[in-house]
Curated annotation (Swiss-Prot):
Similarity-based family: Belongs to the methylamine corrinoid protein family.
Role of this protein: Acts as a methyl group carrier between MtbB and MtbA.
Gene name tied to this protein: mtbC1
Keywords: Cobalt, Metal-binding, Methanogenesis, Repeat
GO biological process, one term: tetrahydrofolate metabolic process
InterPro entries: Cbl-bd_cap, Cobalamin-bd, Cobalamin-bd_sf, Corrinoid_p, Dimeth_corrin_MtbC, Met_Synthase/Corrinoid, Meth_synthase_dom
Stated name of the protein: Dimethylamine corrinoid protein 1
Gene3D superfamilies: Cobalamin-binding domain, Methionine synthase domain
GO-annotated cellular components: cytosol
Listed PANTHER family: METHIONINE SYNTHASE (PTHR45833:SF1)
Residue ranges of every copy of the B12-binding N-terminal domain listed in the record: 1-91
Binding site for methylcob(III)alamin: 105
UniProt GO molecular function: cobalamin binding; cobalt ion binding; methionine synthase activity
Domain (B12-binding) ranges: 92-216
Length: 216
């Protein structure tokens, strides 16, 4: 008889291998002895967290991350189909994520969106080169708890401050947390502009989002 720990390890390793078939096979085995929520949180999401760490260390690359996320989505869909009617995977929070106006780089931001989604957040990725007002309008539209603002150049960093200022003007700052990131951003910069947190990479973005939105 395979233990729960071994099944969770198998789920995690299947995600890291980026093989959808292996993930689905592991899910089928695990659901005989575990609840869907446990399989998702302690098996699939744990594997996806490890994928994020390996990506940051240069051990895995962007295609691997996307394949792993796709495999996890497939596994979650199987589990959701088995849940009683009226239940669904609990969302940890709603996040709007984008790269500020004037900045056309978005690989790092896309990785953050993928990792946040895999961790259980509802993510609205609004792309790159996004006008300041669009961040706030989207947050209003989807009733977001957090906005993630990426800037990859020193010339576009100011856009992060402008989003925060606009949130204040709209009376939304108390309700919406702000996370900043990108190569020129630092914790000191986040403190200076009044952001709630700074994330150096995708793994840290997930940890900080959980801390701010779930850890209360």
């Amino acid at each position: 008889m395979t233990s729960k720990e071994e099944l969770l390890q198998e789920l995690s390793e299947a995600i890291i291998s980026c093989k959808k078939d292996a993930v689905l096979a592991a899910v089928e085995k695990a659901k005989q002895v575990m609840e869907p929520a446990e399989i998702i949180e302690n098996g699939l999401a744990a594997g996806m967290n490890q994928v994020g760490v390996l990506f940051e260390r240069g051990k895995l690359f962007l295609p691997h991350v996307m394949m792993a996320a796709d495999a996890m989505t497939a596994g979650v869909k199987v589990l959701e189909a088995d849940m009683p009617a009226g239940t669904e995977t609990k969302k940890l929070g709603v996040i709007v994520n984008g790269t500020v106006e004037g900045d056309v780089h978005d690989i790092g931001k896309s990785i953050v969106s993928t990792m946040l989604q895999s961790a259980g957040f509802e993510v609205h990725d609004i792309g790159r080169d996004v006008p300041i007002k669009n961040f706030v309008e989207k947050a209003k539209e989807v009733n977001a708890n957090m906005i993630g603002i990426s800037a990859l150049m020193t010339t576009t960093l100011q856009g992060q401050r402008e989003v925060i200022e606009l949130l204040k003007e709209e009376g939304m700052r108390e309700k919406v947390k702000v996370m900043v990131g990108g190569a020129p951003a630092t914790q000191a910069w986040a403190d200076k502009i009044g952001a709630d947190c700074y994330a150096e990479n995708a793994s840290e973005a997930v940890a900080k989002a959980k801390e701010l939105l779930v850890g209360k």
